[in-house]
């Protein structure tokens, strides 16, 4: 039991570090008109457990979000920080995704925070009409924290299940 608790606390620590260091959210989705898979990457900020991305509808994955197709989001440990390239920490989850429109008060606040974290390019693309701001509220998923170490996660805090996943 003590080893399981240590492993759990280590996994929580790895999740927290991943979310602190990561700068991009991976987005994958099926295309409702074909068997194609659309995939993209977007810089994100995270506020109170909600991820925010500002992305162009020129990307197929963004059009899929707009069409309400099922989306799988993931955050992957940067290779630079990984102790073992074969065991990079990775988190994948489903989410409730909502667009924040330009006329909403929250739009300006979030765009400013994205610019603070990711640079002044945001101040340029903020005016581009093909870009959309999305709030992504995690529902359920899985985090892999190393070889043989994976946990279910749930909710905006991405709370780990008490027991690790197993092959049994």
Predicted region positions:
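Residues in well-ordered beta-strands of folded domains
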Residues: 28, 45, 54, 74-76, ...
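Structured helix-beta-strand junction loops
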Residues: 21-22, 68, 117, 128
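Short acidic, glycine-rich loop/turn motifs
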Residues: 29-33, 77, 145
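An N-terminal domain-cap segment
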Residues: 1-66
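Conserved hydrophobic/aromatic beta-strand scaffold that supports enzyme active sites
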Residues: 24, 39-43, 92-94, 131-135, ...
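Short, structured beta-strand-loop surface elements
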Residues: 58-117, 140
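Catalytic micro-motifs at enzyme active sites that drive phosphoryl/nucleotidyl and oxygen chemistry
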Residues: 30-31, 40-41, 61-62, 80-84, ...
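C-terminal edge-of-domain segments
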Residues: 2-10, 113, 121-168
């Amino acid at each position: 039991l003590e080893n399981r608790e240590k492993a759990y606390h280590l996994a929580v620590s790895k999740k927290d570090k991943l979310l602190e260091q990561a700068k991009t959210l991976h987005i994958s989705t099926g295309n409702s008109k074909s068997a194609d898979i659309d995939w993209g990457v977007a810089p994100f900020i995270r506020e109170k457990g909600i991820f925010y991305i500002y992305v162009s509808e020129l990307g197929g994955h963004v059009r899929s979000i707009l069409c309400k197709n099922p989306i799988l989001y993931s955050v992957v440990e940067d290779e630079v920080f990984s102790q073992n390239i074969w065991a990079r920490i990775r988190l994948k989850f489903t989410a409730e995704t909502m667009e924040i429109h330009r006329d909403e008060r929250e739009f300006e606040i979030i765009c400013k925070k994205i610019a603070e974290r990711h640079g002044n390019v945001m101040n340029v693309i903020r005016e581009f009409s093909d870009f959309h701001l999305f709030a992504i509220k995690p529902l359920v998923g899985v985090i892999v924290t190393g070889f043989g170490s994976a946990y279910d996660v749930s909710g905006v805090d991405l709370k780990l299940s008490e027991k690790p996943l197993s092959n049994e």
